[in-house]
Amino acid sequence: MIVGVGIDVLEVERVPEKFAERILGESEKRLFLTRKRRREFIAGRFALKEAFFKALGTGLNGHSFTDVEFLESNGKPVLCVHKDFGFFNYAHVSLSHDRFAVALVVLEKRKGDIIVEGDESFLRKRFEVLERSVEGWEIETSLPPFTLKKLLESSGCRLVRYGNILIGE
């Protein structure tokens, strides 16, 4: 089920490099320092974050640009959250940045695809356990990632994967 869709467009030249300090998280800053085209990187990350908050339907209300980061996997941006934003376990992300930065973020709630390790009897009491995989137990839950992670850790269990969302510290 699609939870939200956000899009943002901005002119790359209008985004100053000093903007990096305000909008980039620590991992994004490390990526930024390796880039030759830094202005495009900042504009792209700003557009992605604006699109993300639009997809949430909240705007920045009560949130900070550094609460989310867009890291990279195989050259593509991947969402990393640093706090709970509600329930979605997939983020589909697209970014283009040449003269304009254009970002699209689609947040989706898929059944299952949340993998945990731990005591089977505890997991079956608390969640709908779908199946056992090589990675661990696949469960169904409506708990957002940090709430789930805290509950699991307090019970000696561990969150292995939360869809395609990276969970920051």
Curated annotation (Swiss-Prot):
GO cellular component: cytosol
InterPro entries (alphabetical): 4-PPantetheinyl_Trfase_dom, 4-PPantetheinyl_Trfase_dom_sf, ACPS, Ppantetheine-prot_Trfase_dom
Protein residues bound to Mg(2+): 8, 50
Cofactor: Mg(2+)
Keyword Transferase belongs to the record: yes
Subcellular location: Cytoplasm
Keywords: Cytoplasm, Fatty acid biosynthesis, Fatty acid metabolism, Lipid biosynthesis, Lipid metabolism, Magnesium, Metal-binding, Transferase
The EC number(s) this enzyme carries: 2.7.8.7
Database matches in Gene3D superfamilies: 4'-phosphopantetheinyl transferase domain
Superkingdom, natural source: Bacteria
Catalysed transformations (reactions): apo-[ACP] + CoA = holo-[ACP] + adenosine 3',5'-bisphosphate + H(+)
Enzyme class: transferase
Entry's Gene Ontology BP terms: fatty acid biosynthetic process; lysine biosynthetic process via aminoadipic acid
GO molecular function: holo-[acyl-carrier-protein] synthase activity; magnesium ion binding
Main location: cytoplasm
Family: Belongs to the P-Pant transferase superfamily. AcpS family.
Functional note: Transfers the 4'-phosphopantetheine moiety from coenzyme A to a Ser of acyl-carrier-protein.
Protein name, per record: Holo-[acyl-carrier-protein] synthase
Organism: Thermotoga maritima (strain ATCC 43589 / DSM 3109 / JCM 10099 / NBRC 100826 / MSB8)
Gene designation: acpS
